Amino acid sequence: MARVTVEDCLEHVDNRFELVMLSTKRARQLATGGKEPKLAWENDKPTVMALREIAAGLMDYAVIAEAEIVEDEPLFAAFEDESNEAV
């Protein structure tokens, strides 16, 4: 297993706070099984895999935000009905 350092990850994000927030969101996606890893899973925990993806430059806020928008779309489909009639 390759060791992931904070310095490797900071080359792709602005600061440590962003790194924590980004890696948390990505690890949660991986842990819940909703998203597939972008690297080969080498018996790593979701947090390590998230950091490996960030260090490789495969994950940033744009990718996370895009995934969240796609997940939210079905929730708002019910509100697109244009009828305002009382039930």
Swiss-Prot record:
InterPro entries: DNA-dir_RNA_pol_omega, Pol_omega/Rpo6/RPB6, RPB6/omega-like_sf. Belongs to the RNA polymerase subunit omega family. Promotes RNA polymerase assembly. Latches the N- and C-terminal regions of the beta' subunit thereby facilitating its interaction with the beta and alpha subunits. The keyword ATP-binding does not apply. The keyword Heme does not apply. It catalyses: RNA(n) + a ribonucleoside 5'-triphosphate = RNA(n+1) + diphosphate. SMART domains: RNA_pol_Rpb6. GO terms for molecular function: DNA binding; DNA-directed RNA polymerase activity. It holds the Pfam family RNA_pol_Rpb6. Its EC number is 2.7.7.6. The gene is rpoZ. One of its GO terms (biological process) is DNA-templated transcription. PANTHER family: DNA-DIRECTED RNA POLYMERASE SUBUNIT OMEGA. HAMAP family: RNApol_bact_RpoZ (MF_00366). This is DNA-directed RNA polymerase subunit omega. The RNAP catalytic core consists of 2 alpha, 1 beta, 1 beta' and 1 omega subunit. When a sigma factor is associated with the core the holoenzyme is formed, which can initiate transcription. Keywords: DNA-directed RNA polymerase, Nucleotidyltransferase, Transcription, Transferase. One of its GO terms (cellular component) is DNA-directed RNA polymerase complex.
